[in-house]
């Protein structure tokens, strides 16, 4: 593939990773199954999941928040890719906290756990929340052997909180109430709920 000088990422096929290793930002090569690459990959998946959510019709304030988070996640991925460098700041974490408070302020208080779902944008926000939690687990796993910044770890924890609140807020925008978890739901269902054509 021909490349032009000045185009940072114009060369896509490099073949350097065919042996199962990949390069970090500092030039070192590590296995593609390493803890650091796993954390980077989870961060990439989280960002892509937010991209799917952004493809939905959304309130403009939510859209701008999510777009900002996508940029933050590139900072976070860059920090993971450059051991010893710090890109995620306390200010970015605090901004998430402000957004959580702002979006949560107009929501009714929860008296029970809620099920992920409702409108499609809300369901995608909940999906992004679970991917964020998985990303956080991968980061913590890496942190045990290769310490990471406090701000980076806190960012992912706050982001999952924000995505939970956004899921509720997006349902409210769609006129959809929270779907509350009902303890023992299936044991309370009447006998006539047996699927048609099934046999006891």
Question: What is the meaning of each model-derived region?
Answer:
Residues 1-200:
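Phosphate/pyrophosphate-binding loop motifs in nucleotide- or prenyl diphosphate-using proteins
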């Amino acid at each position: 593939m021909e490349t032009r000088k000045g185009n940072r990422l114009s060369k896509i096929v490099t073949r350097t990773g065919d042996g199962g290793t990949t390069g970090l930002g500092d030039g070192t090569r590590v296995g593609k199954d390493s803890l650091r690459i796993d954390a980077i990959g989870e961060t990439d998946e989280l960002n892509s999941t937010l991209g799917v959510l952004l493809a939905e019709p959304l309130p403009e304030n939510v859209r701008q928040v999510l777009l900002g988070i996508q940029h933050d996640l590139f900072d976070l991925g860059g920090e993971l890719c450059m051991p010893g460098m710090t890109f995620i700041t306390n200010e970015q974490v605090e901004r998430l906290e402000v957004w959580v408070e702002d979006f949560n302020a107009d929501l009714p208080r929860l008296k029970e756990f809620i099920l992920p779902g409702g409108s499609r944008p809300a369901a995608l926000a909940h999906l992004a929340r679970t991917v964020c939690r998985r990303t956080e687990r991968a980061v913590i796993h890496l942190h045990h052997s290769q310490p990471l910044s406090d701000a980076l770890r806190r960012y992912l924890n706050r982001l999952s909180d924000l995505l939970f609140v956004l899921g509720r807020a997006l349902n409210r925008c769609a006129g959809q109430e929270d779907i509350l978890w009902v303890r023992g739901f299936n044991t309370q269902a009447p006998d006539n709920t047996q699927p048609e054509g099934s046999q006891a």
